[in-house]
Regions:
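Residue-level detector of beta-strand face positions
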Residues: 213, 229-231, 275-277, 323-325, ...
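C2-type phospholipid-binding modules
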Residues: 193, 287, 292-294
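Extended substrate-binding grooves/exosites of carbohydrate-active enzymes
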Residues: 1-213, 218-224, 229-238
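Intrinsically disordered, low-complexity Pro/Gly/Ser/Thr-rich segments with frequent PxxP/GP/PP motifs
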Residues: 227-272, 279
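Extracellular and select intracellular beta-sandwich modules with Ser/Thr-enriched
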Residues: 240-242, 291-296
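Short acidic/polar inter-strand loop motif in beta-rich domains
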Residues: 278-286
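Buried hydrophobic-core signal for structured, non-transmembrane domains
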Residues: 210-218, 259, 274-278, 330
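Beta-strand/loop-rich accessory regions of lumenal/periplasmic or secreted enzymes
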Residues: 260-269, 284, 298-383
Length: 383
């Protein structure tokens, strides 16, 4: 019925009119969440919601986390509980809490700005585990940049700050958060989406013996609408390959099968993988026959530990007022007594480092860090 527009009697009236006009439509509105009069309602701010608490909310019942999005009893005129950007813990709480009886939909999640969308599989592991969880809508589909040329003549995508005079308020790159670039070029996040959403999953049973499980994630189609292939690979080469016979398997069901690769010589220290894939068997309105719809890679051998006979040498330790010196033959290491940093490392007089090795717990901030979660402020003590 709307987006980020508050909640009140006007929305109740819109819902009633919609149900009267077309009772087959379900009503969704994220703004209609939580009834403050409910005895279990907890008005917790966004900052407090990040803090795990343990609070008794009813006789013999304990809730691990109470946040705005885990509050009960959304208004009766919405058919589903709609939430934005819940944490995994909050989403699991919604999925399991007995006071929630309606299905749950994420009207926005997996904000795809900059280097992002890497947590998608964690959300879908939860969604597939709980029938109450319907899924969600990634914000958003496409970048809203405008084509222009930079000073060197190269085409680039312009956004807030590229047009306004200095000092004028704008939203910066907060419109560059899609799965596609403005010219419909596929961005890396889209490949993660394809993998997480693929209709067929290949799971390990005993890959070393060729045993795998094929899971049909479809709601209506059998596995026989696809063709299947396999490859046995080392790090660089295809060693064996063939087609894979998958019995017709109903939607939501799975089947265990064997991949018919032949015994092969394994080199110590090498890794070997099964690559499995599914393809459209016939032409579809959205894809030609042979379009790859699913893929997986399963390890069939662990990396063997390489044995090295290390030379046995005597280590001499010398203590100084400000450092410790460790020597063994022509190798030298110096550690600062005050900081604990390794300040020097050399072999045959040749330095291996150009300065002290310091612990670094801070990575470069992503767009979502800077523009959304504000980690540079909330977690700056790790800098």
């Amino acid at each position: 019925m709307g987006n980020e527009s508050g909640c009140g009697p006007a929305f109740a009236a819109v819902s009633a009119w919609t149900k009267d006009a077309d009772p087959t439509r379900f009503i969704h509105y994220e703004g209609a969440q939580g009834v403050p009069e409910h005895p279990l309602y907890r008005p917790i701010s966004r900052s407090q919601a990040a803090v795990a608490t343990s609070e008794v909310v009813a006789a013999g019942e304990t809730a691990a986390r109470f946040a705005e999005m885990a509050n009960p009893d959304d208004p009766a005129y919405v058919d589903i509980l709609s939430r934005m950007y819940p944490t995994l813990e909050e989403l699991e709480f919604l999925a399991e809490w007995p006071h929630v009886s309606r299905p749950v939909l994420l009207c926005e999640y997996a904000h795809s700005m900059g280097n992002s969308t890497g947590g998608l599989n964690d959300y879908w592991t939860l969604i597939r585990r709980h029938k109450r969880l319907l899924g969600g809508h990634i914000w958003d589909w496409i970048d809203q940049g405008i084509e222009r040329r930079d000073a060197s003549g190269r085409i680039c995508w312009a956004y807030g700050g590229d047009f306004e005079p200095a000092g004028e308020v704008h939203d910066g790159n907060f419109c560059i958060n899609g799965l596609l670039a403005p010219d419909r070029t596929v961005k890396p996040a889209m490949y993660e989406c394809k993998y997480v959403f693929q209709p067929i999953a290949f799971e390990p049973v005993d890959p070393a013996q060729g045993r795998i499980r094929v899971v049909n994630r479809n709601f209506f189609s059998s596995t026989d609408v696809y063709d299947y292939k396999w490859e046995l690979r080392d790090e660089n080469h295809v060693l064996q390959s063939g087609t894979l016979a998958v019995p017709p398997t109903a939607p939501g069901e799975s089947v265990e099968i064997s991949v018919p690769y032949k015994p092969f010589r394994q080199i110590p220290g090498a890794e070997y993988w099964l690559r499995l894939s599914a393809y459209e068997a016939q032409e579809r309105p959205y894809a030609e026959a042979g379009w790859k719809v699913a893929a997986e890679q399963l390890k069939i051998s662990a990396l063997s530990a390489l044995r090295r006979d290390l030379p046995q040498g005597r280590v001499v330790v010398r203590e100084y007022a400000d450092s410790l010196l460790f020597t063994s033959g022509s190798a030298k290491i110096v550690i600062s007594r005050s900081s604990g940093y390794l300040t020097s490392c050399s072999l045959d007089g040749c330095p291996a480092i150009c300065g002290p090795l310091k612990p670094d717990f801070w990575r470069a901030a992503t767009d979502n860090d800077r523009r959304g979660w504000k980690t540079d402020v909330l977690l700056d003590f790790w800098k």
